[in-house]
């Protein structure tokens, strides 16, 4: 039902034109739920999973000729929003999370744990956790090795990407045009990185591909539906636009990766959670470039169990 065709994640039957669609996020806040949906469809291809309480895959396939793809598109869009609502009820520990701010990495981790436990052999022994990372230096190299080890074992990994408030594109509007001036743009391009997007690293055997090579991973990018290999260890300017495989963002700020179920997951305390919400609420009105997940990485915040 879901497979990679021509570097796109396609969902549906491929026997006739108009039956399959490229799985993409339905709006600017659903990159997280779309990654989760992609993981579920790829890990359980034979499962007769009712995507909603109203419509199953079999019912979608019985649509009028030429309308099957449109039917699937509507079905998957509704499912993304359902996943998001379920995640955000307890987005930060016991606290709810507003839809306008996307989804938190901890709720994504919980959902990934559930998906893997039900869709992969021995998945119940794995629990997904959030780990904030620095995407450069020897420590990042070791992190990439860990990511690739999970992928080689058939387990997907979610990457949290982002960048500064404004990306330095070297395209500055003329003075007096009402746009951000060159000095302000340069200053904003040097601000701390903000988490903006989720992408899904895919096990290569799951998508019928060979190992992409040392340091590389196949990444599903939900805004375009593309699946391409990227060298995660390649140097990237943290102030400029990043590769399309990372959604155009230059930084990897966190990884949501499987570990032994006996390991505990760190959750933000209530005071830190409220600081996170308050700080991000202030940022929303100042975000110049479009983003998906609009919560802040806050790499310096302390987390505890």
Where are these regions (language model features)?
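Active-site signature of cysteine proteases
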Residues: 150-152, 162-305
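Predominantly the structural core of cysteine protease catalytic domains
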Residues: 87-204, 264, 268
